[in-house]
């Protein structure tokens, strides 16, 4: 089903043109910018404001690193990281996404107010998560595919048919949400690049995004920014220096139908999309 609007809390986000989700990591150990914006809330808020100036349509705020092999973070620590920033950005009048896989963090944030989207790498598998979101009238949801858990997901991931298996998993998660009373227009899906996938799995998924979107019937949100696949493709070992490859991958995703791209390098991505569209490429 073709859909051109994502119901996301206070906003109906138009998907007729690709949207940019800017990443605000409040973690000391994220793979790319860990510790850069987690020192204090004011540093993080200044970064978030800069992302909006550069062209971000959505801010995605997270307090737990889900990189491969990431250390455990308690729910108390995760909430302590995100709460002061969420409390401030809630009044900015822009779509705010919370990147979390814990029901308790979702519940606290939704009670705080001003949170429009729950972006969950675990696809609402935490106990009570689906029921919590079903009780919300309009909160947007992004369900992501991951094989395994962050601590072990990159240890020899295997698939018989990566596109088919990812599609079936995401369809099943979306179906559970709808059965619980969540409206389909609130749902987007993320195939989970580099979450329990080899480089070849990631390449195959990217090349077959149109089939994945057709099979699932939902808009796709794609996150490839600065990830290991970009490093493997370009030979760049420094995650922070993978911006050029990340922009190219974001454009490749959009060209294949992705509606939202989650990125660190907002200005470069926004400029690339503007130039590409102006030069007559059908996005």
Curated annotation (Swiss-Prot):
GO biological process: folic acid biosynthetic process; tetrahydrofolate biosynthetic process
Effect of residue 218 to F: In strain: BT054 and MO124
Record annotation: effect of changing residue 152 to T: In strain: MO124
Protein's gene: folP
Start and end residues of each Pterin-binding domain: 18-274
Keywords of the record: Folate biosynthesis, Magnesium, Metal-binding, Transferase
Catalytic activity: (7,8-dihydropterin-6-yl)methyl diphosphate + 4-aminobenzoate = 7,8-dihydropteroate + diphosphate
PANTHER family recorded: FOLATE SYNTHESIS PROTEINS (PTHR20941), FOLIC ACID SYNTHESIS PROTEIN FOL1 (PTHR20941:SF1)
Function: Catalyzes the condensation of para-aminobenzoate (pABA) with 6-hydroxymethyl-7,8-dihydropterin diphosphate (DHPt-PP) to form 7,8-dihydropteroate (H2Pte), the immediate precursor of folate derivatives.
Disulphide linkage map: none
Resulting phenotype, residue 194 to G: In strain: BT054
UniProt-reported outcome of changing residue 96 to V: In strain: BT054
Residue stretches spanning the membrane: none
Complex formation: Homodimer.
Effect listed in the UniProt record for changing residue 68 to P: In strain: BT054
PROSITE patterns to which the protein is assigned, alphabetical: DHPS_1 (PS00792), PTERIN_BINDING (PS50972)
Protein name: Dihydropteroate synthase
Enzyme class of the recorded protein, top EC level: transferase
Cofactor(s) needed by this chain: Mg(2+)
Protein EC: 2.5.1.15
Result when mutating residue 259 to Q: In strain: BT054 and MO124
Pfam family, one: Pterin_bind
């Amino acid at each position: 089903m073709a859909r051109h609007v994502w119901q996301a809390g206070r906003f109906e986000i138009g998907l007729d043109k690709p949207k940019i989700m800017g990443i605000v990591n409040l973690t000391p150990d994220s793979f790319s910018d860990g510790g850069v914006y987690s020192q204090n809330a004011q540093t993080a808020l200044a970064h978030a404001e800069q992302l909006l100036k550069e062209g971000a349509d959505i801010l995605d705020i997270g307090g737990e690193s889900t990189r491969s092999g990431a250390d455990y973070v308690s729910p108390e620590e995760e909430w302590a990281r995100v709460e002061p920033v969420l409390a401030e950005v809630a009044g900015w009048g822009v779509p705010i996404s919370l990147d979390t896989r814990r029901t308790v963090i979702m519940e606290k944030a939704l009670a705080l107010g001003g949170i429009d989207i729950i972006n969950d790498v675990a696809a609402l598998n935490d106990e009570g998560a689906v029921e919590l979101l079903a009780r919300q009238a309009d909160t947007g949801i992004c369900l992501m595919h991951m094989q395994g858990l962050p601590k072990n997901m990159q240890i020899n991931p295997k698939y018989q048919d990566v596109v088919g298996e990812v599609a079936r998993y995401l369809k099943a998660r979306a179906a559970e949400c709808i059965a619980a009373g969540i409206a389909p227009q609130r749902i987007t899906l993320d195939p989970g690049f580099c979450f329990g996938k080899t480089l070849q799995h990631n390449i195959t998924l990217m090349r077959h995004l149109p089939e994945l979107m057709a099979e699932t019937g939902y808009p796709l949100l794609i996150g490839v920014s600065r990830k290991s696949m970009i490093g493997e493709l370009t030979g760049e070992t420094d995650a922070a220096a993978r911006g050029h490859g990340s922009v190219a991958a974001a454009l490749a995703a959009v060209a294949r139908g992705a509606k939202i791209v989650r990125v660190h390098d907002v200005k470069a991505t926004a400029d690339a999309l503007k130039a590409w569209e102006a030069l007559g490429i059908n996005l």
